[in-house]
Amino acid sequence: MSEMKWAIITGADGGMGTEITRAVAKAGYRIIMACYHPQKAEVVRERLSKETGNPDLEVMAIDLSSMQSVVAFASQILERNLPISLLMNNAGTMETGFHTTSEGFERTVSVNYMGPYLLTRKLIPLMVRGARIVNMVSCTYAIGKLDFPDFFHRGKTGTFWRIPVYSNTKLALLLFTFELSEQLREKGISVNAADPGIVSTDIITMHKWFDPLTDIFFRPFIRKPKKGASTAISLLLDEKEAGVTGQLYVNNHRKNLSDKYTNHVQKEQLWEITERALASWLK
């Protein structure tokens, strides 16, 4: 397999992560499975390697809620000087309560936004021309709001509400996608976002975030991980998506967003504040 075909996939052992890893493995990439639970991921790695006939799958530990862990992970990749063709920021969480990380950030914000932001920024020097970055967002970006500085430390002023906080992180990740795509356009690196729809993943099945009435409303629309992952897989691998950048895709199609999002009034401000918040780890 080509030395130039390296892919990094966060949350590669989860529902959608497994589907994405399977597709990328079948396409012949050497894969770093960046996972929070290495032992669990090792079982998935072994199974996928046998299924796809691709022996070049490797598990590496990462805790996206810890910026120090993200830096340590990125440092290992940088030391190996791996030419990265694909970066899939797939991992995510929806905390059921308010949790502050050891670095002082709200945990949902760290895992869903700050960790992926930092990881991506650290790995850009290794990305080859034509590389693709895909960020997994959510339809909930539409109800997200960015209140600074509470966004980083509390997520929402006052009582912690998990769905609004989760939505805020997905809006932030979408705006990061748009801003980064502009900065990397001349380097020939594409940056896009994938909305998987409402998918049956650990966020739903383990955290039980919806009440019975919400369950009744959403259950008919909940997708299997394979279907939810299809849009991200298309953005990563389809030749017709080569060169496409700064877009949000839903159901394997480009979504036409209004200026409210593509030129969001807080897009540049979010970038600047995030850079300051992560300054000590971006060095």
Identify what each model region corresponds to:
Residues 72-79, 96, 102-110:
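Active-site Tyr-X3-Lys motif and surrounding loop/helix of classical short-chain dehydrogenase/reductase
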Residues 17-18:
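N-terminal Rossmann-fold NAD(P) dinucleotide-binding loop
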Residues 92-100, 106, 132-187, 195-210, ...:
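Catalytic loop of short-chain dehydrogenase/reductase
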Residues 13-14, 37:
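Conserved glycine-rich cofactor-binding loop
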Residues 27-43:
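Conserved glycine-rich Rossmann-like NAD(P)H-binding loop of the short-chain dehydrogenase/reductase
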Residues 169, 193, 216-255, 264-268, ...:
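C-terminal helical subdomain
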Residues 38, 60-75, 102:
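The beta1-alpha1 cofactor-binding region of Rossmann-like NAD(H)/NADP(H)-dependent oxidoreductases
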